[in-house]
Amino acid sequence: YFIDELKNWKHLFDAAVASSDRSSDLLTSCGIEVINLNAAPPIDFYIDGADEINPDRILIKGGGGALTREKIVAAASEQFICIADDSKQVEKLGIFPLPVEVLPMSRSLVARNLVELGGRPIWREAFETDNGNWILDVHGLLIEDPRELESTINDIPGVVANGIFAQRRADIVILGSNDGIRRI
């Protein structure tokens, strides 16, 4: 969607950094050069979607399984712009299951810890991230303090990253609806 439109504007930039192998393939198929983050100059902006967005521009991302790389690229970017349809906006995060990327050997340990936090983790079987890890989708987790919960989950041994984007929230959110677009 966005990448399809981006090909019409590729004359305005030199290259792109992709946050997933799938995005990299799409960019390349549109004739856009993809460079590794390690070889990239400072990144002016990162544009991506979200699974949930609260009024403070804190997000849940990772439904596609690329949350770790998305966090890295967002952290490396001067500005993080989130575009989504208005159905993704919620008052409180947690309706969408929270993706947690884990090292394969730690899946059960991490799952037990997530249960202690009040969640119901479900292993996303037959799925491997671009980093060779697994995803636990955590249902029913009460997300009162997204920033605190993001840190708490990241501190569990074996967790690579989780899909709460509170420490690096979006700078700009653009929501589309049948009535037009609005910015948060």
Task: Annotate each PLM feature.
Residues 21-184:
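Conserved phosphate- and dinucleotide-binding cores of soluble alpha/beta proteins
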Residues 7-10, 95-96:
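A short, structure-level motif marking secondary-structure boundaries and short turns
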Residues 10-16, 58:
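Short active-site oxyanion
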Residues 1-6:
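N-terminal active-site wall of soluble small-molecule enzyme domains
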